[in-house]
């Protein structure tokens, strides 16, 4: 797995380089302190991941990531920065992670493990047919407290629309996503998630109990959570077919 580091502070660059070499099998093929130099390099070289600061000369990290997102081959991007206010932009660019300085070594080592696993999965996916069932290690990026949290998709219990935002719930956490529920639902595997209501989608694997409700609708009770998700009248027929009712 080939990676580059984009960081204009020499000591920070050296520290990150050491951590990558010490805790992963990744090959560092370049270190840069200037955004335009990175673009020139990527025109002739393919890498699998980029560790990217935001406050760098010539072209800041966010603009650099926007340019890279247009490439046919899109490397994983991990932002490592002191600027917490760009987390939502990083999410919109589908960054793999967003790490704030100063960081703990454990934060970097955990990210490296997940990144190598995601890259290995990507290599497998490129040579095998696309899976129709959610695998345990399939992940999605969720936003919490201006951080990007890489989350197993099957950890999601349900999502609820709030105006132009979507609240996403796992067993122990909640996340606020900067998108409407239709856009969020499009990122989920349809084999496991169902849009049961205009304001809700639910993980079918997390349903504990189905209770008939008014006007031939249903209320869904979920495993481990004290919450009821409605099924609207317009979705009842499709829901019955999915659940073989």
From Swiss-Prot:
The modification 4-aspartylphosphate is found at residue 53. Residues 2-116 form the Response regulatory domain. Gene3D superfamilies: 2.20.25.10, 2.40.50.40, 3.40.50.2300. GO terms for molecular function: DNA binding; phosphorelay response regulator activity. The keyword Magnesium does not apply. The keyword Nucleotide-binding does not apply. Residues 140-245 form the HTH LytTR-type domain. Keywords: Cytoplasm, DNA-binding, Phosphoprotein, Transcription, Transcription regulation, Two-component regulatory system. GO terms for cellular component: cytoplasm. Phosphorylated by YpdA. SUPFAM superfamilies: CheY-like. InterPro entries: CheY-like_superfamily, LytR-like, LytTR_DNA-bd_dom, Sig_transdc_resp-reg_receiver. It is found in: Cytoplasm. Pfam families: LytTR (PF04397), Response_reg (PF00072). Its main location: cytoplasm. PROSITE patterns: HTH_LYTTR (PS50930), RESPONSE_REGULATORY (PS50110). Member of the two-component regulatory system YpdA/YpdB. YpdB regulates expression of yhjX by binding to its promoter region. This is Transcriptional regulatory protein YpdB. It comes from Escherichia coli O6:H1 (strain CFT073 / ATCC 700928 / UPEC). The gene is ypdB.
